């Protein structure tokens, strides 16, 4: 069995028969769904190689409270994969409920790797900009996926803040350049606990950026989108773009 030989399953109870999905889904990044999910996987997913260093598997793992987004991913790729749920103890001893989906596919995984979702990508992942062909709309669908994974949209003491936590310098540079190019905004960069924190917090800039992030959006993490809508509703006219 290919999965067992390459240590991609731990025991028989994890094995699922008659799996169906669109293995060619990521062959080209030419619409909202593909761009969004690529960004989301870059943030909250990972790829693995088999024992022969061939692309073998991709997974997405998130908090159980956001299980809706995994069901949306399954719908996009026409998948019948099981979403698995488990408890995990953090380094501080806190127990968190998580859910995950794993797809074993050399073809699909190799595509993700070519787009920058490389194994152990945390510090060395990159964004293959060529795949977007300078298409601004696709770029912001990708950024929305990435921010739904690793971003926050908050209002604190009257201040609006969009924040991304990024550990790869390459990914940071690409996203900063996009925000400067398409929004004419210079995001603030700080370093905290070994990671870069990119933030947009000037009120006018905040709404300019988020308006682009959610423009023509059909896929998004609803709780973050609702935060944005509540901020729009509370903002006074001069704060809006």
Regions found by a protein language model. Give the residues of each.
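Internal intein/HINT superfamily modules and their associated LAGLIDADG
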Residues: 1-241
């Amino acid at each position: 069995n290919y999965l067992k030989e390459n240590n991609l399953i731990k025991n028989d109870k994890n094995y699922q028969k008659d799996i169906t999905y669109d293995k060619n889904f990521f062959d080209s990044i030419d619409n909202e769904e593909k761009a969004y999910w690529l960004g989301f996987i870059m943030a909250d997913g990972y790829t693995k190689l088999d024992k022969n260093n061939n692309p073998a598997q991709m997974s997405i793992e998130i908090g159980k409270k956001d299980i809706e987004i995994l069901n949306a991913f399954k719908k996009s790729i026409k998948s019948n994969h099981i979403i698995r749920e488990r408890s995990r103890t953090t380094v501080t001893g806190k127990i968190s409920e998580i859910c995950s989906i794993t797809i074993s596919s050399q073809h699909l995984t190799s595509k993700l790797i070519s787009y920058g979702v490389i194994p152990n990508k945390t510090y060395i992942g990159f964004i293959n900009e060529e795949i977007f062909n300078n298409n601004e709309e696709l770029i912001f669908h990708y950024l929305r996926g990435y921010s739904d994974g690793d971003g926050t949209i908050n209002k604190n003491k009257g201040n609006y803040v969009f924040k991304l936590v990024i550990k790869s310098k390459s990914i940071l540079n690409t996203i900063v350049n996009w925000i400067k190019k398409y929004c004419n905004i210079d995001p603030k960069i700080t370093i905290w606990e070994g990671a870069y924190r990119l933030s947009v917090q000037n009120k006018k800039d905040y709404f300019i950026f988020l308006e682009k992030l959610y423009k023509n959006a059909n896929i998004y993490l609803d709780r973050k989108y609702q935060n944005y809508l509540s901020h729009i509703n509370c903002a006074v006219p001069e704060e809006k773009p």
